[in-house]
Design a protein with these regions (language model features):
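Short acidic, glycine/serine/threonine-rich loops at helix termini
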Residues: 94-96, 117-119, 138-143, 160-163, ...
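Charged (often Lys/Glu-rich) extended helix/loop segments that serve as interaction or gating elements
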Residues: 11, 289, 295, 303-433
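Conserved active-site and cofactor/substrate-binding residues in soluble primary-metabolism enzymes
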Residues: 39-42, 58-65, 77, 89, ...
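Conserved residues at the C-terminal ends of beta-strands
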Residues: 129, 152, 228, 267, ...
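Short, glycine-/Ser/Thr-/acidic-enriched flexible segments
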Residues: 62, 89-91, 112, 133, ...
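Structural preference for beta-strand elements that scaffold enzyme active sites
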Residues: 81-83, 102-104, 123-127, 148, ...
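Active-site loop/helix belt of alpha/beta enzymes
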Residues: 1-20, 179-331, 398, 425
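A charged N-terminal "starter" segment
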Residues: 1-172, 208, 212, 216-217, ...
Length: 433
């Protein structure tokens, strides 16, 4: 018998299909009197009518609440900066929201930097990433006064030094170290094992050599080390090994070069719930555990505990976002042993959410435009693109009376959907409201 998310058909009912799990949907999500989905007090049917579908809907209050939660939790854990990872979702409005709540912004391209600048975020609140920053991007960053640039290669040391010298400033930099730790995440988004394009090896000596080269350049000053161990992390175990190795690197740098590492940026990666069965750590619990891990590692190494910095992205904006689709076709397909899977085609797909096809990501979907008393049917929500892998939600229980014109809402699409969107098949990109 078919299941979805480990749920047997016998456990699915009309009532459970319409429920909105608090840890999956935005904090302001609720049902109206006719069963319609309400987001922040707004009827999604009205949004679809005014802005069309597909439509990205972002709950500002939810984003701000999560930004404050990270700011406060990590400050208590010893962080001097929490940088919002702009790659997850960026617009002028979102940049303003997170900055107004006390966060800096981590940008990874000239385009992201331009949006942050347009939003009025001061340079000192910005950190710039990227494994292949162009000279033009670096010059813009330095001239704007970006507070920190993360060094990702030997070539980049010379480029940043040249840009800073031309601008007549001393640029603060961090060295991104790969520490051979892989979080329990999908292979394509785990980024701390050694065989990868990011960073400089801690075990092979490249990170220490980068520090040595930076120290010789008058237009650069090293403020710290950076490490990022992956994405969708649900526990702090990976950080324990990573922190120990980065602290050991900091100790070697001090012992051999006399340079004290003042700041340790442990990146982002905190997971969110896409399904009811997902159970990510509370931000305060995660922050406290990581703070304790770093303090313990420093104490064991005999070095002062550096200031901490973090880069949450998905965990701030992901749960705040919902995508609305309109159903176009409903097609029952007979499978083996008489089982039926119903293919529900919507007016978007992999052009607005590539994550299902790219990572095998799972999502939660619900009927958003009305109430239904129909029995559950096993559905596969698919897009309208010319690809068999164009799947939005692989398996979901939806009402058996689903019909063209109904609205579906997919939860937790605030991160890496719009930012990775395309115009495949020349579909226009959805609006954001």
């Amino acid at each position: 018998e078919f299941t979805t998310d480990g749920v047997m058909p016998s456990a699915v009912s009309v009532e459970t299909m319409s429920q909105l799990a608090e840890h999956v949907w935005p904090r302001g999500a609720e049902r109206g009197g006719a069963g319609e989905l309400m987001l922040g007090g707004v009827d999604v049917r009205d949004l679809a009518q005014e802005f069309g579908t597909p439509l990205f809907v972002l709950d500002e209050a939810d984003v701000r609440w999560r930004a404050r939660a990270f700011r406060d939790a990590y400050a208590e854990a010893g962080a001097s900066w929490v940088f919002y990872a702009a790659k997850a979702f960026l617009s002028v409005a979102v940049a303003r929201w997170v900055h107004e709540e006390g966060l800096g912004i981590d940008v990874a391209s000239g385009g992201e930097l331009a949006v942050a600048m347009r939003a009025g975020v001061p340079g000192e609140a910005l950190l710039m990433h990227g494994n292949n920053k162009s000279m033009a991007e670096l010059q813009t960053a330095v001239e704007y006064g970006v507070g920190r640039i993360v060094i990702d290669s030997f070539e980049e040391i010379a480029r940043v030094a040249e840009a800073a010298a031309q601008a007549g400033v001393v640029q603060q930099v961090l060295v991104r170290a790969t520490v051979g730790v892989e979080a329990h995440t999908h292979e394509y988004i785990a980024t701390a094992h050694e065989d990868q394009k990011f960073g400089l090896s801690a075990s092979g000596g490249a990170a220490e050599e980068a520090v040595r080269r930076i120290a010789k350049l008058p237009s650069l000053t090293l403020v710290g080390l950076h490490s990022h161990i992956g994405s969708q992390i649900f526990d702090a175990a990976g950080f324990e090994v990573a922190a120990a190795r980065v602290v050991a690197l900091a100790q070697r740098i001090y012992d051999e070069q006399g340079i004290e590492i003042e700041e340790l940026n442990l990146g982002g990666g905190m997971g969110i719930a896409y399904l009811d069965s997902d159970d990510p750590l509370d931000v305060q619990e995660m922050a406290g555990q990581i703070g304790d891990i770093v303090a313990k590692a420093c104490a064991e190494s005999g070095i002062a505990t550096p200031r901490l910095a973090f880069e949450p992205g998905r965990a701030i904006v992901g749960p705040a976002g919902v995508t609305l689709y309109e159903v176009g076709t409903v097609k029952p397909v007979e499978l083996d042993h008489g089982q039926i899977r119903t293919y529900v085609s919507v007016d978007g797909g992999m052009s607005d959410n590539i994550r299902t096809a790219l990572y095998g990501a799972d999502y939660t979907v619900t009927l958003a435009s009305r109430v239904s008393q129909a029995e559950p049917m096993l559905c596969r929500v698919v897009g309208k693109h010319c690809e068999s892998g164009d799947v939005v939600v692989r398996d979901a229980w939806l009402p058996g009376d689903l019909t063209p014109g109904d609205l579906l809402a997919v939860a937790a699409t605030g991160a890496y959907c719009r930012s990775m969107a395309s115009n495949y098949n020349f579909l226009p990109r959805p609006a954001v409201v």
